[in-house]
């Protein structure tokens, strides 16, 4: 089975004709308590961070892919050598290209192409003056393990169950937050909101954040289903359902607990307080936040999307999810306000998902009213992107002119990203001041969607170049991906790891699913 292309045949013909330039208990049982020293010495030695002059993807390169190293320094040599790390033999000698002085970074930069090296192995690069690079691999399955590890991060973050070493390894832990929580606005009411994924080290769980992350994971599966298997190494593996859907279903089960069964209202989230003193007069440390319109719309978006994709595996469960999404939508309508501009994006995305899954005209009416607005679409908003992709991919009746408007926005954004990447030192928009990768990941989300529609080789190359950037071919010479590379992001900041960021990891999964699919074509 090949990837499920978004079918907009008439639209693509129109567009492509003109785009020749587009190349718990109160005290949880089983929790681990960590104690530190009573006093921490104030040691603040300034240790300079050393960055190599030869920058590579520290994980490695696919056998037949383009392989480029970036060189930087006060002076540039003429040639470089690729060394077999095991034997010490020189296996390739190349010449530096496109030497130039970078005024912004105050350094010389150059590039070395060693794409003809296709023998599997572990290597590093040496060059006079600049020294050596970190080591890297060449092989056909270089990205397989980080793809699985990125997906497994959500399993590691499961709340309410025991994670055994068989599946979680060093991330194993006892069941946590298994008791009931108190409703923050009325502490006489207790609720079972166990389960789901921890979103940070405190164990917080926010419905809108969860819905957005779930939707990106589901989009990955929708666009590239063949990239996902049923043997990822979680307890549900082997049940006939792709593990990515099993994992999202675990979060869906928690989301359903967050909905009031009588009214359809959706509580905004679960807050874990570090001390009882945070809320005067209250004794528990787990609280359910009050229901909100944003949470209800986000809930409706995620569960409708899940329902649509899960119906082929369990139609009854999918139908129940769709009904829950509809109830949340209707409850939100009762409490929305005219000044709720920020929440309109959630309403749009929820309506798009509900229209595709259920086909009701009321959903379509709102989606098309939103798309017809004069102010246009916010091309930098992830939730709006999710709604747009669903509208142009639905089998329900749509307006061609609105699909054209969406595609024009997507393709314009894709070309802007491409232009920036072409002129970037590291073939991305990354630079010396890069303190997080959220914008780059969002850019790749846009590019991945557009590439799925038109299959542009340049876009595929740019997506892979961003993966090279995240894996060490960047100005800091660090890998932002856990368990990949010699020089981890932890050397400059423990919060920068992509897999350790709840929402960022889902976008990494989307990138890797596209790359895995492109390698099969």
What are these language model-derived features?
Residues 242-263:
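Carboxylate/His-rich catalytic cores and anion/metal-binding grooves
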Residues 30-50:
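N-terminal low-complexity, Pro/Thr/Ser-rich intrinsically disordered segments
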